[in-house]
């Protein structure tokens, strides 16, 4: 999100960040970034006054739930504003994979129809169709939306993480200076919590049997009591909780473990590993969208000439025994580790260049803004959904608003 806000600022927009959420303990101070922060309320007409007075040129919804809540109000009061949905990842895909895992189906990138075509999918796809542009974070999800849900390509825009090399602004340790394994991720995110339990119950015992002196340092915000109870010094399974500097702890580790069995989108922990030149070990789902070749022909040729293969940055295994074997090899064998570290060092420039993706986003916004009426006419199903389903969201919101008003009067 911060990368997108910065990109909008560089395009000349004055950015206002409006949220109904309570401020987190770890929230960024947006005022330091010259971004105005506003508190808004769900199901409250005060937003109508706020958005009408603001009269923005572009409105971006942070995931489909915010689109459901506020897009009808934006359309009513600022009909010429370009409506952008930041999908982050496809929620329905993550939930479909989770449901498949619970049913005993593992490591399946494309869940069966019974899991994929869910009520959640209907809501999220409807939000995508109602918006002028939806930002998708991985090519896999772009392809899924177009092939399985027939979403028009011109309302989708591939916009992954936008990063710059050197964000780890300290000297990165070499192989001999690093030790132990690291796992990192917010415990409130279900795929992360599942990965921690999978490590504790299945993978770490296999790894530790071969590396009895190794430790696994597990970091993440908001660890619940059931997570801290997994801490065991004797087993080398150490729950560390919140990391004050995530890049430092990833850089100090020799290998990052990310055994994600479900989820969607791009995995921030693997991006952190790339920023720190830390080799990683993940799963098919974990590696999704991260390590493909560059779409820049000159870059591809340069990496090929240098013998760099981006796929070396993270080894992939879905079988527990194979995962443990690769973890031990990557930890012990310096030549293999060096090859992986060198590949990781190229991932950011090759796949997630801030300059390249910021320019493409700017071009897409300019193109849609210049032809907004025609763009919307061509998205017939989107206009049909705005006509029908937004009315139901509108009336439900207005009903809740009226109910709350009556309760306040009665109270």
Per-region residue spans from a language model:
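Acidic donor-binding loop of glycosyltransferase active sites
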Residues: 56-57, 132, 251-265, 276-278
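Acceptor-binding helix/loop patch of EC 2.4 sugar-transfer enzymes
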Residues: 80, 85-117
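C-terminal "capping" alpha-helix adjacent to the active site of nucleotide-linked donor transferases
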Residues: 297-306, 315-336
């Amino acid at each position: 999100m911060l990368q997108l806000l910065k990109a909008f600022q560089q395009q000349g927009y004055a950015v206002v960040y409006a949220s109904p959420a309570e401020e987190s303990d770890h929230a960024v101070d947006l005022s330091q970034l010259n971004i105005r922060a506003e508190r808004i309320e769900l199901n409250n007409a005060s937003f109508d006054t706020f958005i009408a007075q603001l009269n923005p040129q572009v409105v971006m919804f942070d995931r489909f739930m915010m689109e459901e809540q506020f897009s009808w109000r934006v359309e009513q009061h600022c009909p010429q504003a370009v409506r952008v949905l930041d999908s982050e990842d496809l929620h329905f895909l993550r939930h479909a994979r989770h449901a498949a895992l619970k049913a005993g189906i593992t490591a399946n990138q494309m869940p069966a129809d019974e899991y994929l075509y869910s009520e959640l999918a209907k809501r999220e796809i409807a939000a995508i169709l109602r918006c002028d542009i939806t930002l998708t974070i991985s090519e896999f999800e772009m392809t899924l939306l177009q092939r399985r849900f027939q979403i028009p390509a011109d309302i989708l825009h591939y916009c992954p993480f936008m990063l710059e090399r050197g964000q780890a602004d300290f000297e990165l340790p070499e192989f001999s200076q690093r030790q132990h394994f690291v796992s990192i991720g917010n415990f409130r995110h279900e795929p992360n919590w599942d990965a921690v339990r999978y490590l504790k119950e299945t993978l770490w015992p296999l790894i530790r049997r071969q590396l009895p002196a190794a430790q696994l340092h597990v970091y993440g915000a908001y660890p619940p009591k059931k997570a801290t109870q997994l801490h065991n010094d004797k087993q080398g399974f150490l729950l560390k909780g919140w990391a004050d500097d995530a890049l430092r702890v990833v850089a100090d580790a020799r290998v990052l473990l990310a055994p994600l069995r479900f989820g969607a989108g791009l995995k921030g922990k693997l991006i952190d590993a790339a920023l720190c030149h830390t080799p990683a070990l993940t799963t098919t789902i974990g590696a999704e969208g991260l390590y493909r070749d560059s779409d820049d022909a000159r870059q591809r040729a340069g990496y090929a000439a240098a013998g760099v293969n981006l796929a070396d940055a993270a080894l992939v295994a879905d079988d527990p025994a194979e995962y443990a074997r690769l973890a031990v090899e990557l930890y012990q064998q310096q030549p293999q580790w060096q090859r992986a570290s060198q590949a990781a060092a190229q991932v950011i420039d090759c796949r997630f260049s801030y300059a390249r993706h910021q320019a493409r986003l700017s071009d897409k916004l300019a193109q849609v803004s210049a032809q907004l009426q025609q763009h919307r006419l061509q998205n017939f199903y989107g206009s049909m959904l705005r006509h029908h389903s937004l009315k139901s969201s509108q009336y439900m919101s207005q009903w809740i608003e009226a109910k709350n008003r009556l309760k306040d009067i009665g109270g």
